[in-house]
Amino acid sequence: MARKLKGKIGSKGLKGALLRHKAKVKLVRNIESKQKHELRKKNSSANNKTVKRNQEFQKLNQGKVMPFEKDETLMLCGEGDFSFARSIVEQNYIESDNLIITSYDNSVNELKLKYPHTFEENYQYLKDLNIPIFFQIDVTKLVKSFKISKNNTWFKIINRLSDHRWGNKPLQNIVFNFPHNGKGIKDQERNIREHQDLIFNFFQNSLQLFNLINTKIQNDTLRYTQGYDLNEDTPQAKKLTAEGYGNIILSLFDGEPYDSWQIKLLAKKNGLTLSRSSKFQWENFPGYHHRRTNSEQDTTKPAKERDARFYIFSKYVSNSSKHNRKSKKDTDSDSD
């Protein structure tokens, strides 16, 4: 083992030089160690900030999950004071050119009386964007309510009200927020049965409307392309089945009596399956006020304090049907 040098750094000769060299090396090492520590600290802080930023971004994105895509088409049923419609447009969740709004009420004047402080401003905002707005639309009689006929086709009706901006787009999503018949039935069992009828008929009529609108588009496209389904992979065709069915979306409060409505069973009876569900996050829809069906008053408990969910239903397609459709597509491709 080397003998430890003793003496003063200022000493002359070899001994002093060695002591000075040793002190210099130690100083350099201390500086390097300090620099490495600072660098590690800085990197750690930067990493923590990055992680925190990513977590906040993920949280924000998770909170912004919508039951529909921005570039898809959407019809809102049973709108009250039109605040939900306005919110999704203002928040850029949907293109105004892809939106249709319907109300069960008879007219603008009726809604002004029902929602005197909120409706008119929302209505004017949406009207200025040339969004087609329909009144007297019963979700249990959709085709009849729209007065669709051979001479008065869906596309004539919708383009007349949208300044011809709808074109021949398919309908991909039908949304009914917090369905309620507005009857205020006290007998709970009867109340449940009537709402089950409402939901069942809504499912049934939505499927009829999808089929009526979208099948024509698909058939016209197939005739134009001589049987080749060139539209199958386009954004507006992705969520449609071969028969033209899109998504049916319900929002509903948690708990009773809503759980007893058994909407999944009602959907199944219409050949629908639950694709997914997600929490209805009120904060994602600023300006939206869930109202009573017959007045501007809030429900007994403020809606924003109540848990609710979105339910997205789609037409059930068996694996064999999917396989047959894929096989047909592959066969057509091979025959080229």
Swiss-Prot record:
Region (Disordered), start-end ranges: 286-307
> What does UniProt give as the signal peptide span?
none
Q: Which domain of life is it from?
A: Eukaryota
Q: Would you identify the family this protein belongs to, as annotated?
A: Belongs to the class I-like SAM-binding methyltransferase superfamily. BMT5 family.
Gene Ontology BP term (one): rRNA base methylation
Which species?
A: Saccharomyces cerevisiae (strain ATCC 204508 / S288c) (Baker's yeast)
Which reaction(s) does the protein catalyse, per the Swiss-Prot or TrEMBL entry? uridine(2634) in 25S rRNA + S-adenosyl-L-methionine = N(3)-methyluridine(2634) in 25S rRNA + S-adenosyl-L-homocysteine + H(+)
User: What's the name of the protein?
Assistant: 25S rRNA (uridine(2634)-N(3))-methyltransferase
Enzyme's top EC category: transferase
